[in-house]
Amino acid sequence: MSGMVDLKEFLAELGKTQKELKNVIEQAKDIGLELKTNSKMTPEQAGKLYKYIVDGIKEQIQANQPAKNPEQDNKDDLNTAVASKSLNKKVSKTPKKEETKSQPKPKKTKEKKKEAPTPIAKKKGGIEIVNTFENQTPPTENTPKVVSHSQIEKAKQKLQEIQKSREALNKLTQSNANNASNANNAKKEISEVKKQEQEIKRHENIKRRTGFRVIKRNDEVENESENSVTESKKPTQSAAAIFEDIKKEWQEKDKQEAKKAKKPSKPKATPTAKNNKSHKIDFSDARDFKGNDIYDDETDEILLFDLHEQDNFNKEEEEKEIRQNINDRVRVQRKNPWMNESGIKRQSKKKRAFRNDNSQKVIQSTTAIPEEVRVYEFAQKANLNLADVIKTLFNLGLMVTKNDFLDKDSIEILAEEFHLEISVQNTLEEFEVEEVLEGVKKERPPVVTIMGHVDHGKTSLLDKIRDKRVAHTEAGGITQHIGAYMVEKNDKWVSFIDTPGHEAFSQMRNRGAQVTDIAVIVIAADDGVKQQTIEALEHAKAANVPVIFAMNKMDKPNVNPDKLKAECAELGYNPVDWGGEHEFIPVSAKTGDGIDNLLETILIQAGIMELKAIEEGSARAVVLEGSVEKGRGAVATVIVQSGTLSVGDSFFAETAFGKVRTMTDDQGKSIQNLKPSMVALITGLSEVPPAGSVLIGVENDSIARLQAQKRATYLRQKALSKSTKVSFDELSEMVANKELKNIPVVIKADTQGSLEAIKNSLLELNNEEVAIQVIHSGVGGITENDLSLVSSSEHAVILGFNIRPTGNVKNKAKEYNVSIKTYTVIYALIEEMRSLLLGLMSPIIEEEHTGQAEVRETFNIPKVGTIAGCVVSDGVIARGIKARLIRDGVVIHTGEILSLKRFKDDVKEVSKGYECGIMLDNYNEIKVGDVFETYKEIHKKRTL
């Protein structure tokens, strides 16, 4: 009965309760073992079931292997000894084959000569094995199993029984040949035990790890030679001696580890302690840990700590302490800006990380702030309190809300106040669409901008180049729109941009200079350098483009080109023939002289510059001009910088978006594709795009609409912010200037560029007394909505440029009593508005000295007043004129002369040297020696 394993004992070994009995029976069925509540198993069956439950290794039990009877022969104790090792799942199932002595066996066909039985040394102790290894492969049947201390202890007891059984086996073999098979089985079991011991030895060379170490009380003794026939028991070493050896061994190993040896060398110890090695137990293997729980009550183990990794633990503690110290330093307290004392109790409870008396000393890294940022966004990005930011701006004289935008100056002031390092970034870069330009750069035509002073013949010169007449069709003979044209010369194309020369079109000239490759400055030889000429040169210099001078009107008599060159040389533009680097080409727009020379110079300069661009991919263009045309809607003149713009492409330009419907060149011909440096008029826009905006082609309408909406929202919020944000100075000025006279106007123009020029010119007329208030401006005709905007305002005017109101609009204007003024020349519009502002302004009052009289005597007349007897010392004293009464050089009174008499007669005036009587209006405090000084006021009109 001692050889069978009871199911209840099996559960106890597993550490399971009776409630889990059903699960164990079910798992036994999976490997072909039928069990009941009171069943018993052979050790081999128990070992396989144990491995299946704990390790998940499924080994089927053959059906022809019946459970053994408890009343079996005592020889089964040999199997019990080995099965007890299998029960602990730690022994390898692939032992080596062992040679045995050959004996006559009737049931075996292949037999080998059996050698003398190998003596098995008794184990002195368990060997601790590492559960997991680095870079270990999953366990297989060839992987040695791990044997614990208690398992080896039990195995030793069984080995003693095996020795006794072997002696009995020899006797039984001699007496009864029928028991040969049983003896053979016993020998096999003995060989299995020997192989188990060999597998245990294989783990002795495992590298030691840092962590926990388990020291065993017993030691293992090497087996004697396998060829020895006799068996001898080795004497057991005492526990004190084992611990002494372990202590010496670990002292030596720790010394070696202190030298940072890669592998600890084997310590030289007594033979009993040579193979005693301890290894790190890895608790990450929950399966093995669970399997060893049943041996927790063993008392023959000592758990020691390996402090090899103590330095790592100390390092983590130091890092944690450093982080805590940093947090303590950053934790600051709010500073009260209104008093030197600390805050009141209520405020002191609010411990915010950014508030501290030393908060301004905290060094912060550079913070990226958008160029257009709201107050609350600035606070978030700078990690500041919103209330502190608003309060700081308030103390600086700026009243803002959290949604107001901050300008660049305000951002810099806040950064200085809070001791921040910031970098201001362009907000519009967030809206930029990433353009992927891949392809080969090809040669493109040069873009030439014609600039110069008004009436110097720019458009006439371009007309001569194009063999067209444009100048005569423009009102007043001056260019008021930006034009773009393509000209072919020597099989090469040149794109020309014609800019206005009037002072009101400064921004147009700037846009033309930004997109150009070469600037041609037209100067009239009979007029010389003018203000707009200098401005055009500044635009070209800012754009860093080469300049070619065209001396126009050379057909006129008495022209002096050397004088013109001298004026340009004073500005730093020296001619080539004077040793400089700038070409001065004499031309005549009237006769055409010098035109070919000018074009050749342009092409030579373009060849030197090697102008190239990528033609493949989405287009990127610049809007030169935008307008609204009847029947076509919003249109725009664009020049392509890179890529190709085709009919049907989706695009966006600032707040405008759409799909290209048609493209028309300067000759009025329809084209399908627009390559770099080419210009065309496109249709299909949702609205008129701002002049100078960048047009970008995208994949579809959805992307174009989304990008345009983002920009529209941003610009709208920015405009609202500017309308609400006001400083103390502006507020006080508004209160003081409540009598400010202004003229509300609505401006409508035919193109975006003209509208922009008119607005800028009118705003320059504003001064401290009168101002033009632009209520609304737009491109297109005058509508009823425009009338309703100004109907409630006094002195409101609607200004139209190159447009005419319809009959319905005229009738509504009469009904609303609104004045509509239309112009075709920008000169007339600006001059009339200047005159209108001058009429609202108070005149300039000047004084003119007329005479002076000295008081010699005074006469008090009852019910009349005091009459001063005077002698006129200078000029003429007239009745009704204004006079000052001066006493000791101080003006005592200012009033009018009510009565002037010569003796008893009333007179209008008294000349120098004559006596007269003077009585002032409502003033009688006149004394002898006072002086009357008379003057008259002269009103003069103001000028703007």
Curated annotation (Swiss-Prot):
UniProt: GTP binding residues: 452-459, 498-502, 552-555
Function: One of the essential components for the initiation of protein synthesis. Protects formylmethionyl-tRNA from spontaneous hydrolysis and promotes its binding to the 30S ribosomal subunits. Also involved in the hydrolysis of GTP during the formation of the 70S ribosomal complex.
Keyword rRNA processing: no
Protein name, entry field: Translation initiation factor IF-2
Polar residues composition bias: residue spans: 132-150
Composition skew (Low complexity), residue ranges: 175-185
Keywords from the named record: Cytoplasm, GTP-binding, Initiation factor, Nucleotide-binding, Protein biosynthesis
Domain tr-type G: 443-612
Region (G1): 452-459
Subcellular location(s) of the protein: Cytoplasm
Gene Ontology molecular functions: GTP binding; GTPase activity; translation initiation factor activity
Protein family membership: Belongs to the TRAFAC class translation factor GTPase superfamily. Classic translation factor GTPase family. IF-2 subfamily.
Annotated spans, Disordered: 61-157, 173-281
One family name in Pfam for this protein: IF2_N
Gene3D superfamilies: P-loop containing nucleotide triphosphate hydrolases, Translation factors, Translation initiation factor IF- 2, domain 3
Cross-referenced PANTHER family: TR-TYPE G DOMAIN-CONTAINING PROTEIN, TRANSLATION INITIATION FACTOR IF-2-RELATED
GO BP, sorted A to Z: translational initiation
Gene source species: Helicobacter pylori (strain ATCC 700392 / 26695)
Location of the region described as G4 in the Swiss-Prot/TrEMBL record: 552-555
Chain segments carrying region G5: 588-590
Domain of life the protein comes from: Bacteria
InterPro entries, alphabetized: EF-G-like_DII, IF2_II, IF2_N, P-loop_NTPase, Small_GTP-bd, T_Tr_GTP-bd_dom, TF_IF2_bacterial-like, TIF_IF2
KW Metal-binding (keyword) present: no
